[in-house]
């Protein structure tokens, strides 16, 4: 008993004082580059189109920021904003995951679509947002793409689609896979009408999206070092029993092997698209 008393008396007595510096920077003020880890002011980064000042890494843009960057002020008209996913297979927890992503992103689904003008030229646009279910393609994403393509076909508008996706949405099973064929049919009608489709592939674009509408543009563009592919690198290596090149499935690798027309730095994105639309308009007229 006395031994325990003396042992207790030897214990250090102290108070934990919280570091006041921990809360000096409000949330959202700073952003860390996922590539070089440099910390930058979010406002300045946004003004630079989310391109890192230090390593030139192209950090993901939200769907609305992307549209804002390539459209005249106030010209964007959104289509089908209220369309949301059901749970056709009664997949456990799917509704909760959708609701969580809706709250986190402010989006109803992984794609925003509509019409806009760029330097006065009207066009249809669809932009995938990888923050929502990793940009996976389900029934709503496929339906929204088809609706905007069909609108462009009817009104004879060029169409631009920005891909950013992990592939088909597993929670919707075969219904998600059906969107690959469904979107391709709409694009075929658009093409048969003699209209322009620009596929702009961003990081990452994989799975069923890379194997369908992302790869069949009249002009296929991409951003530097974007990951583009169908199956994962490890799966391919195990299947063919060979080591793949270090730059395999990058935009630069695909450009070198003829699968892309050009890799565009984000600062040149608006000007490049404007020039293409102007040329198409002149030829069409």
Swiss-Prot record:
NCBIfam families named among the record's database cross-references: accD (TIGR00515)
Binding positions (Zn(2+)): 33, 36, 52, 55
Entry GO terms, CC: acetyl-CoA carboxylase complex
Lineage: Bacteria, Bacillati, Bacillota, Bacilli, Bacillales
Entry EC number(s): 2.1.3.15
Biological processes, Gene Ontology terms: fatty acid biosynthetic process; malonyl-CoA biosynthetic process
UniProt catalytic activity: N(6)-carboxybiotinyl-L-lysyl-[protein] + acetyl-CoA = N(6)-biotinyl-L-lysyl-[protein] + malonyl-CoA
Superkingdom per UniProt: Bacteria
Keywords from the named record: ATP-binding, Cytoplasm, Fatty acid biosynthesis, Fatty acid metabolism, Lipid biosynthesis, Lipid metabolism, Metal-binding, Nucleotide-binding, Transferase, Zinc, Zinc-finger
Entry note: cofactor: Binds 1 zinc ion per subunit.
Zinc finger intervals, C4-type: 33-55
Record flagged with keyword Lipid metabolism: yes
Subunit and interaction comment: Acetyl-CoA carboxylase is a heterohexamer composed of biotin carboxyl carrier protein (AccB), biotin carboxylase (AccC) and two subunits each of ACCase subunit alpha (AccA) and ACCase subunit beta (AccD).
EC top class, as a word: transferase
Family from the record: Belongs to the AccD/PCCB family.
GO MF entries: acetyl-CoA carboxylase activity; ATP binding; carboxyl- or carbamoyltransferase activity; zinc ion binding
Role summary: Component of the acetyl coenzyme A carboxylase (ACC) complex. Biotin carboxylase (BC) catalyzes the carboxylation of biotin on its carrier protein (BCCP) and then the CO(2) group is transferred by the transcarboxylase to acetyl-CoA to form malonyl-CoA.
Subcellular location: Cytoplasm
Cofactors that this protein relies on: Zn(2+)
Residue ranges constituting the CoA carboxyltransferase N-terminal domain according to the UniProt record: 29-285
Pathway recorded for this protein: Lipid metabolism; malonyl-CoA biosynthesis; malonyl-CoA from acetyl-CoA: step 1/1
Pfam families for the chain: Carboxyl_trans (PF01039), Zn_ribbon_ACC (PF17848)
Coiled coil residues, start to end: none
Name this polypeptide is given: Acetyl-coenzyme A carboxylase carboxyl transferase subunit beta
């Amino acid at each position: 008993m006395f031994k325990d008393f003396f042992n207790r008396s030897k214990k250090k007595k102290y108070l934990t004082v919280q570091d006041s510096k921990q809360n000096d920077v409000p949330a959202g003020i700073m952003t860390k580059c996922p590539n070089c880890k440099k910390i930058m002011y979010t406002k300045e980064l946004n003004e630079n189109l989310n391109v890192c000042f230090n390593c030139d890494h192209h950090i993901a843009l939200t769907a609305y920021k992307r549209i804002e960057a390539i459209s005249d002020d106030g010209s964007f008209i959104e289509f089908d904003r209220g369309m949301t996913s059901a749970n056709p297979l009664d997949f456990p927890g799917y509704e909760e995951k959708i609701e969580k992503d809706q709250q986190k992103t402010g989006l109803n689904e992984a794609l925003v679509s509509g019409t806009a003008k760029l330097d006065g030229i009207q066009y249809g646009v669809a932009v995938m947002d990888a923050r929502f279910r990793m940009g996976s393609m389900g029934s709503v994403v496929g339906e929204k793409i088809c609706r905007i393509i069909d609108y462009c076909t009817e009104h004879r508008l060029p169409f631009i689609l920005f891909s950013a996706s992990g592939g088909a949405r597993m929670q919707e099973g075969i219904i998600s896979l059906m969107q690959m064929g469904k979107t391709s049919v709409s694009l075929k009608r658009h093409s048969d009408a003699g209209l322009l489709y620009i596929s702009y592939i961003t990081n990452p674009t994989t799975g069923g999206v890379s194997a369908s509408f992302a790869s069949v543009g009249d002009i296929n563009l991409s951003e530097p070092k974007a990951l583009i592919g169908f199956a994962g690198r490890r799966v391919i290596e195990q299947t063919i029993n060979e080591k793949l090149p270090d730059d395999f499935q990058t935009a630069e690798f695909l450009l070198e092997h003829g699968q892309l027309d050009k890799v565009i730095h984000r600062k040149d994105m608006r000007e490049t698209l404007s020039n293409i639309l102007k040329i198409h308009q002149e030829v069409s007229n």
